């Protein structure tokens, strides 16, 4: 393991003190502006809004020059009882090229016994090289796809016994959590959401029930499309940090269909309904994330005009890594 120079220190924290949060978010914003991609997932950013998950660990890397400067941040989640702990990290652009990312990952590995899953958002060359150098293998690949919302959209076709309506906060919460669990039974990161996870997102400034669509059959929820808008026309903050630094962008945030309603074309219909809504908001483009191994979903999105835009990679060391795209 690399011995840290005297001018560099790595501090582990549980919840972060409120005074530290602006410094972390400023670092994240700086990296986002430089790289053109968010270095942290929404899950981590949401927890940071509240000081971090008390079950997780936040590591701060400081460089002590004339005064302490925050040069790196990492979030470590070791709560999964089966999988290796997972981490996400970011190094301030002004401090890159000094091996600080390697130091931060090695500090995390020392806490996890050498087992770790590590997300690299945007597939940046430096992150890829560091992962290979430290003995990580690709475990999963997420594709970001985008579409021009000004391009024509096909009509919505639904079975006669299915209706689409919008989400009713409070009234639909429990039923949606149950549907989400059924729809993502094979994807525990999404399917294990609790009411707290739902309510935390409902408290975000971007939450809009008018863009949260539910498919209902015989009084039962059988599918949904939750849309999201990144940024705002006024350039105001819509996440835990500052503005996004780009024009507003729509997202197919979560799309799910009850397994017993598969084959009815609900995924396609719900996608089109959401895209029409985002276009009504005068948004020029829409994005989504999809697992690289989910061929049916990729075919659906490509048939609706989406094209590959970027890639996020989950690396693993000391686990069961077996190639790309394990879901």
From Swiss-Prot:
Q: What class of enzyme is it?
A: transferase
Subunit details: Monomer.
Q: Which EC numbers does the record give?
A: 2.3.1.189
**Pfam families in the record:** Acetyltransf_1
State where acetyl-CoA 2 binds. Answer: 255-257, 262-268, 294-299
The similarity annotation says: Belongs to the acetyltransferase family. MshD subfamily.
The entry's protein name is: Mycothiol acetyltransferase
- What's this protein's function? Catalyzes the transfer of acetyl from acetyl-CoA to desacetylmycothiol (Cys-GlcN-Ins) to form mycothiol.
Q: What is the lineage of its organism?
A: Bacteria, Bacillati, Actinomycetota, Actinomycetes, Acidothermales
């Amino acid at each position: 393991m690399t011995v840290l120079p005297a001018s560099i220190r790595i501090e582990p924290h549980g919840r972060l003190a409120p005074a530290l949060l602006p410094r972390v978010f400023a670092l994240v914003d700086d990296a986002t502006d430089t790289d053109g991609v968010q270095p942290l997932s929404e899950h981590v950013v949401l927890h940071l809004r509240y000081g971090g998950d008390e079950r997780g660990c936040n590591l701060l890397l400081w460089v002590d020059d004339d005064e302490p400067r925050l040069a790196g941040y990492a979030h470590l989640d070791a709560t999964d009882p089966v999988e290796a702990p997972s981490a996400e990290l970011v190094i301030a652009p002004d401090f890159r090229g000094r091996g600080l990312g390697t130091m931060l990952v090695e500090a995390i590995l020392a806490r996890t016994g050498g087992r770790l899953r590590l997300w690299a958002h945007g597939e940046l060359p430096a992150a890829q090289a560091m992962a290979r150098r430290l003995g990580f293998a690709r475990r999963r690949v997420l594709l970001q796809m985008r579409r021009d919302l000004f391009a024509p959209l096909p009509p919505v076709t639904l079975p006669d016994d299915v209706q689409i309506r919008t989400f009713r906060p409070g009234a639909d919460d429990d039923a949606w959590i149950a549907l989400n669990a059924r729809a993502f039974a094979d994807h525990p990161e999404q399917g294990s959401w609790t009411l707290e996870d739902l309510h935390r997102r409902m408290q975000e400034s971007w939450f809009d029930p008018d863009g949260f669509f539910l498919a209902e059959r015989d009084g039962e929820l059988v599918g949904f499309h939750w849309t999201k808008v990144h940024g705002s026309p006024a350039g105001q903050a819509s996440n835990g940090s500052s503005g996004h630094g780009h024009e507003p962008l729509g997202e197919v945030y979560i799309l799910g269909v009850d397994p017993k309603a598969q084959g009815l074309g609900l995924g396609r219909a719900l996608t089109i309904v959401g895209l029409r809504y985002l276009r009504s908001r005068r948004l020029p483009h829409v994005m989504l994330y999809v697992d690289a191994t989910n061929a049916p979903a990729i075919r659906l999105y490509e048939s609706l005009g989406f094209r590959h835009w970027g890639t996020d990679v989950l690396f693993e060391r000391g686990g069961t890594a077996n190639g790309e795209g394990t879901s």
